[in-house]
Amino acid sequence: MIRNLIFLGAPGSGKGSTALEISTKYDIEHISTGEIFRNEIKNKTPLGLKVAEIVNDGKYVPDELTNQIVLKKLKELKQENKKFILDGYPRTLNQAMFLSSVLDEKILAVLLEVPTNLIIERLSFRRICPICKSIYHLKYNPSKKGEFCENHLENLTKIEARQDDSEESIKKRLKIYNEETKPMIDYYKKNQSLVVINSEESVKKVASLVIKKVFND
């Protein structure tokens, strides 16, 4: 049975890549709050300017702002009768409780666990195409076209590091994650709606583990 999912885990745990793999396989809407915010920043909207200031300081966007953005998207999907995967939300206990209050059905949380040293390595060497959002890694999954994305044959598009992937920013984000996000994990454990997955393997391997545990496929 296809059901709505939340992907939880520290920055660099593979939430986005794994969610994309599964959403493509099952034709589920992949909602990345990070991607929504990055688009707002790129377009220099009032929201984007506010978010940029927060992100550049290595902090998370306030709950009330994030909640309203997610709620708007969920209302759209409900009208379309579509299932979804939430990636990057909720991040705090308050967000988790807000989400539970606005959903008609119980949601399953998938926690991706990975050691801190591997997280720092993953993020420090991560590169992303600004156009198609393809993700590369300078050590483990480099682009076959060097510093350019493989998917744009006519117009060379340079892959780039995300602004919040500096080592200093990574350490700040991990500190905030440990302080704010872990209480939320206990919340889902208590509600018996948490599946824990070891995320040290490749994206395809991790996705297959999620599929086996969640969809019995």
Swiss-Prot record:
Q: What class of enzyme is it?
A: transferase
- For this protein, the Enzyme Commission number is 2.7.4.3
Q: Which residues bind AMP?
A: T33, R38, K59, Y60, V61, G88, Y89, P90, R91, Q95, R162, R173
List the InterPro entries.
Adenyl_kin_sub, Adenylat/UMP-CMP_kin, Adenylat_kinase_CS, Adenylate_kinase_lid-dom, P-loop_NTPase
Q: Give me the reactions it catalyses.
A: AMP + ATP = 2 ADP
Q: Which Pfam families match?
A: ADK, ADK_lid
Binding positions for ATP per the UniProt entry: G12, S13, G14, K15, G16, S17, R126, I135, Y136, E201
State its location(s): Cytoplasm
Q: What does this protein do?
A: Catalyzes the reversible transfer of the terminal phosphate group between ATP and AMP. Plays an important role in cellular energy homeostasis and in adenine nucleotide metabolism.
The record's comment on protein family reads: Belongs to the adenylate kinase family.
> This protein is called what?
Adenylate kinase
- Source species: Mycoplasma mobile (strain ATCC 43663 / 163K / NCTC 11711) (Mesomycoplasma mobile)
Top-level taxonomy: Bacteria, Bacillati, Mycoplasmatota, Mycoplasmoidales, Metamycoplasmataceae
